[in-house]
UniProtKB/Swiss-Prot annotation:
The chain crosses the membrane at residues 34-54, 78-99, 114-134, 179-199, 227-247, 289-309, 321-341, 348-368. Heme b b566 binds at residues 98, 197. A ubiquinone binds at residue 202. It comes from the Eukaryota. The gene is MT-CYB. It is a multi-pass membrane protein. This is Cytochrome b. It is found in: Mitochondrion inner membrane. Its cofactor is heme b. It comes from Pachyptila turtur. Component of the ubiquinol-cytochrome c reductase complex (complex III or cytochrome b-c1 complex) that is part of the mitochondrial respiratory chain. The b-c1 complex mediates electron transfer from ubiquinol to cytochrome c. Contributes to the generation of a proton gradient across the mitochondrial membrane that is then used for ATP synthesis. Binds 2 heme b groups non-covalently. Heme 1 (or BL or b562) is low-potential and absorbs at about 562 nm, and heme 2 (or BH or b566) is high-potential and absorbs at about 566 nm. Belongs to the cytochrome b family. One of its GO terms (cellular component) is respiratory chain complex III.
Amino acid sequence: MAPNLRKSHPLLKMVNNSLIDLPTPSNISSWWNFGSLLGICLMTQILTGLLLAMHYTADTTLAFSSVAHTCRNVQYGWLIRNLHANGASFFFICIYFHIGRGFYYGSYLYKETWNTGVILLLTLMATAFVGYVLPWGQMSFWGATVITNLFSAIPYIGQTLVEWAWGGFSVDNPTLTRFFALHFLLPFLIAGLTLIHLTFLHESGSNNPLGIVSNCDKIPFHPYFTLKDILGFTLMFLPLTTLALFSPNLLGDPENFTPANPLVTPPHIKPEWYFLFAYAILRSIPNKLGGVLALAASVLILFLIPFLHKAKQRTMTFRPISQLLFWILVANLLILTWVGSQPVEHPFIIIGQLASITYFTILLVLFPIIGALENKMLNY
């Protein structure tokens, strides 16, 4: 009998083991769809980004005009740009749901997979930040100035580091050029890290909503989950295209329709919505270095999650107190996101400070305590 090429060919064999014959738990829910959605987001962003890069000029005098030219004169340039800009929002929606799923169902106990995932998040955040600077509007310029300036809070080397990053004494042409280079490069790094992420995942196999070993009940990935993923793609592309076609600027900042002007500061400098929670934590601390450390900690705390797991059960499926705490954390993050979009004045300052304290308390203190408490409750 002739060998099956799908199973014998060195390259096809890898694809087969990852996407076709992969043994998958039969009970994984739609929360497990977000991984593949992130993959399709990445592919869409790389494709639209490549098409945009063909018409973009990384020069302070031409960047704004080149983006306007793309939207006005390039065939479907407006659509490509709108899909790329709003695609970033959907990328973050998916990654936040994906992290939330991992947190709720204890997927972080696959430490290597979790850690590569956190590195992926950090790389994605860096990519989105440098990408936001490229249209060279007011919010692009001032966002770049404010965020890069945070590095100057690092003792001794801070100022040197910032000027080195800028390529001068302020955000200018060298900054824009290197940000474009980074924005082009980083998505391919993300693609590489994704393969590492999947390699680690396939070492152990997928977790499932019950958090129990599922080796006795696995089904092939294709056709069951390929079909389920295609449904997921459809359900994601529908709101993405709706947003890109009907209200493409809904999530953007009107300030970015004004070309960058170093002499005029916008009344409210704020990042895109997906960074607002971290921005609110940064602003809630009056000290510059303290704010920067809190900002870094707000994301880096994810590396600690596997070590803070004290419960005997892996998932929160049968842990009602942890569930309650989880949804309080979600609400808290939404409050932080809202506060981050508001001006720095009473009552938003105190709300932001309380929400920031709550965020760290829930993750560092309450989750381990409640996990241990639920272990005690299992004995009664």
